[in-house]
């Protein structure tokens, strides 16, 4: 019996499910799943607020879990699926962990380090290159983020209005 090979879209849907967990925790909704040999070895969603940890990005959480599962920080041939283009910190962690590929959904024009703002993953000064596949379920990934930030702006506006009416 042969093993089923799951598609980029399949794994990105899994990452989107994890991103919704971040939303439920009132964190920026980014999710990540780390896959090695067609098997999940790490999962994560943004948790820096709840964990009081600026490094608790979805990608870092998934890489940490993957290292524990593999009993090695070198995650050679692993693929990281993430709903948003990685930041500089996460791109650096991907290089140090030696993953083979990152697959992301939405681009991040403000802090994206996989081609939007800069390309850390292919920088000639780095000792490892990570292959990049982008745009998988990009519209769904971007919509989740847009909806979240729209909701947050509305909440802030309502709080300010309530505060000004009590002053």
UniProtKB/Swiss-Prot annotation:
Gene3D superfamilies: Cytidine Deaminase, domain 2 (3.40.140.10). It catalyses: adenosine(34) in tRNA + H2O + H(+) = inosine(34) in tRNA + NH4(+). Its cofactor is Zn(2+). It comes from the Bacteria. Pfam families: MafB19-deam. Zn(2+) binds at residues 57, 87, 90. Disruption phenotype: Mutation makes E.coli resistant to the toxic proteins encoded by the gef gene family. Disulfide bonds: none annotated. Keywords: Hydrolase, Metal-binding, tRNA processing, Zinc. SUPFAM superfamilies: Cytidine deaminase-like. GO terms for biological process: adenosine to inosine editing; tRNA wobble adenosine to inosine editing. Belongs to the cytidine and deoxycytidylate deaminase family. Catalyzes the deamination of adenosine to inosine at the wobble position 34 of tRNA(Arg2). Essential for cell viability. Homodimer. This is tRNA-specific adenosine deaminase. The lineage of its organism: Bacteria, Pseudomonadati, Pseudomonadota, Gammaproteobacteria, Enterobacterales.
């Amino acid at each position: 019996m042969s093993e089923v090979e799951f598609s980029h879209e399949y794994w990105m849907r899994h990452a989107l499910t994890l991103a919704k967990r971040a939303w439920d925790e009132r964190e920026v909704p980014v999710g990540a799943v780390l896959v090695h040999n067609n098997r999940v070895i790490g999962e994560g969603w943004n948790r820096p607020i709840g964990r009081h940890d600026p490094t608790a990005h979805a990608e870092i959480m998934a890489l940490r879990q993957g290292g524990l599962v593999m009993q090695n920080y070198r995650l050679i041939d692993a693929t990281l699926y993430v709903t948003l283009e990685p930041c500089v910190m996460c791109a650096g962690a991907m290089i140090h962990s030696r993953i083979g590929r990152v697959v992301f959904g939405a681009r991040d024009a403000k802090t994206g380090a996989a081609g939007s703002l800069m390309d850390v993953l292919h920088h000639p000064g780095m000792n490892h290159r990570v292959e990049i596949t982008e745009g998988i379920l990009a519209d769904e990934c971007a919509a989740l983020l847009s909806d979240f930030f729209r909701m947050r702006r509305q909440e802030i506006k309502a709080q300010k209005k309530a505060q000004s009416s009590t002053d």
